[in-house]
């Protein structure tokens, strides 16, 4: 069993660089299947989700070279082979293979996607879009088959009943080579959607409106290879900014796009966090007294659900009472009892997280229950007096590139051990 051990209470200082966006790259890699030549992705994070996607792609027949933060993907040999089991089941983002395989072959048979347990996250919106474009859906045991019965996908007008990043991206991928025009209304607006659309447009697709709530895709016959720089990970950036405010003695977070973090930064300003925003970095000063705030998550450009948990340890340092309401994923509260185990005055009440501070945390054995809860526990461990042991760390390694090395470079006493 692997665990992360932190001896907390150290003041951190220095500079940390943000890696490429996890939530982009997990869609960009499957999207390369649509190309008829090599696609090169730069800025790819060193995370286990990428490792799993590379394994899946190679099983399908892709030839992939990986050097540093660059992936060179030759999708020409990809075959439409059924993949009902294996890594495809443990990876939430595996659903993007439905869009790419439908777009290339008109069919796909894959195991149902996994990932973090954050409450209901059905793929109904994805299936509704695929059906509108002419695909049929059937179930074979624990896998699902989509097929167009030998016909190409057809452009369609698609209204998303709820705002969904995954369904918006999957529809864009599937529609890129469909016959005719596809219009997505009530589309999600996240930066990662723009990133995927940029890759596809550079491959020869005709996509307009990414980043707005109406996206139009004019299908094309073929897509070619290209080179693409993955955008910085706004969630990783927010995580390190929150950590810097909680325990830092002057930390510069680089490779940051401020415009992707405006709602998050606004809440830090409300708390009284002192920081300097530069062109592609944010310098976070050592903090004094912070004020408790209340937060409600919402789709972009609102406060990101993925930043709710990493921000929580910083909130615990603030004076006063506050609350967190996650309107996106109702079960994103599993970090609360773990923080309480460390001495935090925090609980759940009527579906809302409530807290009171300031708190002095103490090291304790805790368990990461999902990716962002794991990030919260790492920050809490850095803040706490004494030794913190975090188990179930595979969740953390899914989404934070070289996290041990990055924190060590700032002065943290943190290590990954195997027992």
Swiss-Prot record:
The keyword Cell cycle applies. Keywords: Cell cycle, Cell division, Cell shape, Cell wall biogenesis/degradation, Cytoplasm, Peptidoglycan synthesis, Pyruvate, Transferase. Signal peptide: none annotated. One of its GO terms (biological process) is cell wall organization. It catalyses: phosphoenolpyruvate + UDP-N-acetyl-alpha-D-glucosamine = UDP-N-acetyl-3-O-(1-carboxyvinyl)-alpha-D-glucosamine + phosphate. SUPFAM superfamilies: EPT/RTPC-like (SSF55205). GO terms for molecular function: UDP-N-acetylglucosamine 1-carboxyvinyltransferase activity. Gene3D superfamilies: Enolpyruvate transferase domain. The modification 2-(S-cysteinyl)pyruvic acid O-phosphothioketal is found at residue 116. UDP-N-acetyl-alpha-D-glucosamine binds at residues 92, 121-125, 306, 328. Cell wall formation. Adds enolpyruvyl to UDP-N-acetylglucosamine. NCBIfam families: murA, PRK09369.1, PRK12830.1. This is UDP-N-acetylglucosamine 1-carboxyvinyltransferase 1. It comes from Streptococcus agalactiae serotype V (strain ATCC BAA-611 / 2603 V/R). The lineage of its organism: Bacteria, Bacillati, Bacillota, Bacilli, Lactobacillales.
């Amino acid at each position: 069993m692997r665990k992360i051990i932190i001896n907390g209470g150290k003041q951190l200082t220095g500079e940390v660089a943000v890696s490429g966006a996890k939530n982009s790259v997990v869609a960009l890699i499957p999207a390369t299947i649509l190309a008829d030549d090599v696609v090169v992705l730069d800025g790819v994070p060193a995370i286990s989700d990428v490792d799993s996607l590379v394994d899946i792609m190679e099983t399908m027949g892709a030839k992939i070279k990986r050097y540093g933060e660059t992936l060179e993907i030759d999708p020409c040999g990809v075959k439409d082979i059924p993949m009902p089991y294996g890594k495809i089941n443990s990876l939430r983002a595996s659903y993007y293979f439905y869009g790419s395989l439908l777009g290339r072959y008109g069919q796909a048979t894959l195991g149902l996607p996994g990932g973090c347990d954050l409450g209901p996250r059905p793929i109904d919106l994805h299936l509704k879009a695929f059906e509108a474009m002419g695909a049929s859906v059937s179930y074979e045991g624990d896998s699902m088959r989509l097929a167009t019965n030998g016909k190409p996908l057809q452009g369609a007008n698609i209204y998303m009943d709820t705002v969904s990043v995954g369904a918006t991206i999957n529809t864009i991928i599937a529609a890129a080579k469909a016959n005719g025009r596809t219009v997505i209304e009530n589309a999600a607006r996240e930066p990662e959607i723009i990133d995927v659309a940029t890759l596809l447009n550079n491959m020869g697709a005709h996509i307009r409106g990414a980043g707005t709530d109406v996206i139009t895709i004019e299908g094309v016959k073929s897509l070619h290879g290209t080179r693409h720089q993955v955008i910085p990970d706004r969630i990783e950036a927010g995580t390190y900014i929150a950590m810097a405010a909680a325990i830092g003695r002057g930390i510069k977070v680089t490779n940051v796009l401020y415009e992707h973090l405006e709602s998050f930064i606004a809440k830090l300003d409300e708390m009284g966090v002192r920081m300097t925003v530069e062109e592609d970095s944010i310098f976070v000063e050592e903090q004094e007294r912070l004020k408790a705030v209340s937060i409600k998550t919402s789709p972009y450009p609102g406060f990101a659900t993925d930043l709710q948990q990493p921000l929580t340890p910083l909130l615990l340092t603030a004076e006063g009472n506050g609350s967190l309401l996650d309107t996106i994923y109702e079960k994103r509260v599993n970090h609360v009892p773990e923080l309480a185990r460390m001495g935090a005055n925090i609980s759940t009440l009527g579906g809302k997280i409530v807290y009171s501070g300031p708190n002095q945390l103490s090291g304790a054995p805790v368990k990461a229950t999902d990716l962002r809860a794991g990030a919260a526990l790492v920050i809490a461990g850095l803040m706490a007096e004494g030794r913190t042991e975090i188990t179930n760390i595979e969740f953390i390694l899914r989404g934070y590139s070289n996290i041990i090395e990055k924190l060590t470079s700032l002065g943290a006493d943190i290590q990954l051990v195997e027992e």
